[in-house]
């Protein structure tokens, strides 16, 4: 039975609020995967249905290996999400938003797990012309482009 939902970035603002919502509205067990680079342990919700794992999205296949068959859906919020800082920490932005997110996409595609991906106005704003304004916006735009291609190539549903 697929009774687990995964939330990457589960200790950030959006992820922690989503976890609370899922606890209130569903009976699923929840796994939060967060590297705590911007999320906080203060955002953890004390509930027996939630398991918090410290780790990077690039390692998702190894980290969740034992739970693959039980995962229903994955909500991906665990990306580097700071526009200004993406200029100062471009390597970290690319590691998270390109390498980590690619691992998430492949994990979901390979294991037929539903993906809910969070886009951003930084890459969608101004009719998509803002995608080259920062490393952050660029990586998010490329991820959306990759998702569209995965949909065409493999009928990947997200």
Q: What name fits each language-model region?
A:
Residues 1-158:
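N-terminal Rossmann-like NAD(P)+-binding domain of SDR-like oxidoreductases, especially those catalyzing
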């Amino acid at each position: 039975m697929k009774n687990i939902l995964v939330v990457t970035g589960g200790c950030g603002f959006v992820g922690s609020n989503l976890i609370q919502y899922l606890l209130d509205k569903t009976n699923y067990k929840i796994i939060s995967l967060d590297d705590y680079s911007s999320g906080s342990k203060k955002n953890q919700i004390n509930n027996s249905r939630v398991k918090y794992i410290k780790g990077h999205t690039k390692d998702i296949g190894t980290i969740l290996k034992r739970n693959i068959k039980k995962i229903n859906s994955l909500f991906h919020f665990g990306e580097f999400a700071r526009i200004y800082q993406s200029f100062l920490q471009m390597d970290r932005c690319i590691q998270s938003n390109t390498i980590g997110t690619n691992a998430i996409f492949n994990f979901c595609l390979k294991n037929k797990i539903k993906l809910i991906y969070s886009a951003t106005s930084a890459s969608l704003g101004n009719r998509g012309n803002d995608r080259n304004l920062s490393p952050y916006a660029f990586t998010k735009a490329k991820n959306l482009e990759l998702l569209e291609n995965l949909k065409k190539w493999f009928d990947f549903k997200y």
